[in-house]
Amino acid sequence: MSSPSIAPVTPDLVRLRATARDKDDAIAQAAQLLVAAGCVAPGYDASMRRREGLANTFLGHGLAIPHGVGEDRHLVRRDGIAVLQLPEGVEWNPGQTTRLVVGIAAQSDTHITLLRRLTRLIQDPAQLEALFTTDDPAVIVAALTGDRAPDTSAAPATDLAERFEWTIAYPSGLHARPATRWAETARGFSARAQVRAGDQAADAKSLVGLLQLGLRAGDSITVSAKGSDAPALLKRLRAVMDSLTAQEKADAERAAQRRAAPVIGWTPPQAQPAIVGIGASPGVAIGIVHRLRAAQTEVADQPIGLGDGGVLLHDALTRTRQQLAAIQDDTQRRLGASDAAIFKAQAELLNDTDLITRTCQLMVEGHGVAWSWHQAVEQIASGLAALGNPVLAGRAADLRDVGRRVLAQLDPAAAGAGLTDLPEQPCILLAGDLSPSDTANLDTDCVLGLATAQGGPTSHTAILSRTLGLPALVAAGGQLLDIEDGVTAIIDGSSGRLYINPSELDLDAARTHIAEQQAIREREAAQRALPAETTDGHHIDIGANVNLPEQVAMALTQGAEGVGLMRTEFLFLERGSTPTEDEQYQTYLAMARALDGRPLIVRALDIGGDKQVAHLELPHEENPFLGVRGARLLLRRPDLLEPQLRALYRAAKDGARLSIMFPMITSVPELISLREICARIRAELDAPELPIGIMIEVPAAAAQADVLARHADFFSIGTNDLTQYVLAIDRQNPELAAEADSLHPAVLRMIRSTIDGARKHDRWVGVCGGLAGDPFGASLLAGLGVQELSMTPNDIPAVKARLRGRALSALQQLAEQALQCETAEQVRALEAQREGQA
């Protein structure tokens, strides 16, 4: 491969002995040099400043590389580099002084070669100091455009005995996920293996080494090997490299479609750079951003004997691998293989020979093991971040994260920050992901909104965000975590966008929108006790999804007419042991008494798939969503099912008005078996008969609704799981989550099929999934024939208001239109059409 050419830098684009008042002035001067040379159009400096809000362009060691955002590439007329020498320096960020500003204008990513060269310059302090003070612009030009960095001791890489040529066909280049597969494959053989790009080569078994090549789509590489099994290694590695291409292209296409999708709801009057994710909880909020990350800890250099240090490092690496394996296994159980792969890639970093070698070299020089490890991690991570590729910047974050895990084993004082380390000013919280318990514990006085790099819109974190009333977006990708703390942003949880550094005009528009929405919510809240009755007199029952007795009062205050879903798994999830029959009985009775005679539907334990409980000692499954969960688990674990049923029937005997609902029913025999167990326990306790219903969550149940209705007293549709199974999409997969849309016509047709089957036996149908809590979704469901809707309490006023403002005949017409649509986007467009006609 021939190395990509450096963007042109000539003496007229170098300004020596300049001074700047501040960072903005330095950026303006660099941009002016580019404008004068015809490289960019006027206004490019604004794009460079917007980039500063998205990422820190300070490389360290006195170097900064301001450049524009990708959306403004139309301002670049030709590639160019402008250099502003500032001998006296200027503060780039607090505590960071820049003495050489390298302004970049590039229509593509050809400047990665320049960034690689700059990282080498950083490793030569004497050469770098000369650039800060030279009076000759040719010296700077030579340093930036020479074939190699000043260090000439290293010879160009040569290939090994066996080889093949390959062109990178991954649209995002070689990032961590495919690089991990490459390294894993190569390590399965004894032969030495190498990947060469131009005059640079990396050990094919080293993840970090592969990433440091900075390979982009279209780059040509030579893969070579030497050893007894070299031919087999190369054959297998090439097969793996080829097999990843289709998935990488599909992922890139989905990401492009998401970015290009029209914005539904509020839009800023001025075009602003936005991080695009998936809307998870509606609402708009304005605030500074705060990135949740581990604390930056000073690591003390405490030298010890090399032998003792080696033992400490080995033990720390072993414990960290065990920790990551446990996290990976837990994530696989709860969220699926896609999210678990994150921790697999992190564990792969611990096998990197460059990282271990660099640590050992520092220890040999007499440094302490913790200090040496920290320095090695930072050196390599800084090199990855400096390549200017946002994908590789994300891998630098991964390396630092796993590095901190090892550091915590070596030095417990280096533990990271948590949710308690929030700024005094209310903020929009950014995180890789949050567990449901973390989300539930958020202080809504301190957190205005939530954005995560991972996750899906039907995840439990998203559901809890809606419960808390926090605007939230998920699946925004690694770029979210590159945003600097303290930057002002607008989060729109409806469209799934985070607008960075908005203008005053945009801020004013957002404030107006927030005030208007607040006024609407106040009107809805004032009428929340009114029934959900359409303008032509049709009544829809409204229930709340509630987990604990103490939550009932708030649900009733919001307008709930009962509890349409009590998730009993939360009695098992939030403790270290299985609740006893008596403990469950007390909870169910307390729930019923809090409802004071209003209906209560209790779902039997729904564990498995995305919900796992360590103390239940469930077996590991490769695909838990298609494994032993819901009713399948209950029938296999009478030690869990029967105490729960006894507790429920005891509560009913003592006056509780309740119904029992079984999850994940897939067949008639399952339902009959469960009914027989209920009948036996009821007879043993001499308890009253209770209505027994089932969840419709899988296509098999929807398709057999007419048959199941012979044996069930009612149906409740779980739209979150039904969507996942109908569309064959893991709802936690950030790459696919945008497509897991409950408004997909295929899902709506399954709901209609369920209703038609239930009507044959005069059974009522409810919905307790996320679609019920969306006013537009609730309108569709009512039009399809759903008789009861159960939702997060905070959603009740808006849903009731929407239903009261429509005629059933209009909702039925809307539902018929939706069933004829081809995509979820077409269904959503019906809402805009209806609102426009209203």
Curated annotation (Swiss-Prot):
Gene3D superfamilies per the UniProt record, alphabetical: HPr-like, Mannitol-specific EII, Chain A, Phosphoenolpyruvate-binding domains, Phosphohistidine domain, PtsI, HPr-binding domain
Region (PTS EI): 274-838
Residue numbers bearing the Phosphohistidine modification: H67, H175, H460
Top EC class for this record: transferase
Domain PTS EIIA type-2: 7-147
Record bears the keyword Translocase: no
Assigned keywords, A-Z: Cytoplasm, Kinase, Magnesium, Metal-binding, Phosphoprotein, Phosphotransferase system, Sugar transport, Transferase, Transport
Subcellular localization(s) per the UniProt record: Cytoplasm
Residue ranges occupied by any HPr domain in the UniProt entry: 161-253
GO cellular component, one term: cytoplasm
Active site residues of this protein: H67, H175, H460, C768
Main location: cytoplasm
SUPFAM superfamilies in UniProt: Enzyme I of the PEP:sugar phosphotransferase system HPr-binding (sub)domain, HPr-like, Phoshotransferase/anion transport protein, Phosphoenolpyruvate/pyruvate domain, Phosphohistidine domain
A single GO BP: phosphoenolpyruvate-dependent sugar phosphotransferase system
Pfam family, one: PEP-utilizers
Family note: Belongs to the PEP-utilizing enzyme family.
Free-text comment about domains: The PTS EIIA type-2 domain is phosphorylated by phospho-HPr on a histidyl residue. Then, it transfers the phosphoryl group to the PTS EIIB type-2 domain. In contrast to classical PTS systems, the fructose-specific PTS has no requirement for HPr and Enzyme I; FruB combines a IIA domain with an Enzyme I and a HPr domains.
Cited function: The phosphoenolpyruvate-dependent sugar phosphotransferase system (sugar PTS), a major carbohydrate active transport system, catalyzes the phosphorylation of incoming sugar substrates concomitantly with their translocation across the cell membrane. The enzyme II FruAB PTS system is involved in fructose transport.
Protein name (Swiss-Prot/TrEMBL): Multiphosphoryl transfer protein
Protein's organism: Xanthomonas campestris pv. campestris (strain ATCC 33913 / DSM 3586 / NCPPB 528 / LMG 568 / P 25)
